[in-house]
């Protein structure tokens, strides 16, 4: 089932939907059962809450924009892109793609996908097996469960596999 969390009050527009477990609206977000994010306000999920530029940190994750707290697993920096195993990155015009089962992504800047994790952003640099982020373009985030879903002005991320897409991402940290 899809859990829709609309953030139209923040001036965000069209919604993007993923099959089965995840749905997204970029830049606004409708979240799957696991994780949802929205900007610029903050709503806290059972484990984590985020604020930009300030941070409220849960036991596992903290985010800040433009400042970044990096976890031991994954970090990103703009504008170069380096891909870790099972991860692919691409920035440029690609509006929609499907990666892992039951996951669909749509964002202004997405180009290619890897088996388990895929990233796409105008500014992405480094990745590790786990995932974490924080970026100037990431106003607000809410993390909820084992799966993860993100959306900044143009960022979307999904559960069974990981997927990112945003026009401006500086760094991320999640563990």
From Swiss-Prot:
Superkingdom: Eukaryota
Swiss-Prot/TrEMBL keywords: Cuticle, Repeat
Residue stretches spanning the membrane: none
UniProt repeat feature Sequence, residue ranges: 17-20, 25-28, 31-34, 38-41, 44-47, 51-54, 57-60, 64-67, 70-73, 77-80, 83-86, 91-94, 99-102, 106-109, 134-137, 144-147, 151-154, 158-161, 165-168
GO molecular function: structural constituent of cuticle
Stated role: Component of the cuticle of migratory locust which contains more than 100 different structural proteins.
Record text about domains: The tetrapeptide (A-A-P-[AV]) repeats found throughout the protein are also present in many proteins constituting the protective envelope of other species.
Name listed for the protein in its UniProt record: Cuticle protein 16.5, isoform B
Provenance organism: Locusta migratoria
């Amino acid at each position: 089932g899809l859990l829709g969390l609309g953030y139209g009050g923040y001036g965000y527009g069209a919604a993007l939907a993923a099959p089965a477990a995840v749905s997204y609206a970029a830049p606004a977000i409708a979240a799957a059962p696991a994780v949802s994010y929205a900007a610029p306000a903050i709503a806290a999920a059972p484990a984590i809450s985020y604020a930009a530029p300030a941070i409220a940190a849960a036991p596992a994750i903290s985010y800040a924009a433009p400042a970044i707290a990096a976890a031991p697993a994954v970090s990103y920096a703009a504008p170069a892109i380096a891909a870790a195993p099972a991860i692919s990155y691409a920035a440029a015009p690609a509006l929609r793609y499907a990666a892992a089962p039951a996951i669909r992504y749509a964002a202004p800047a997405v180009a290619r996908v890897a088996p388990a994790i895929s990233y796409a952003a105008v500014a992405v640099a480094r990745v590790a097996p786990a995932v974490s982020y924080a970026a100037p373009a990431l106003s607000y985030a809410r993390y909820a469960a084992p799966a993860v879903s993100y959306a900044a002005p143009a960022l979307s991320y999904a559960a069974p596999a990981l997927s990112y897409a945003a026009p401006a991402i500086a760094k991320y940290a999640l563990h």
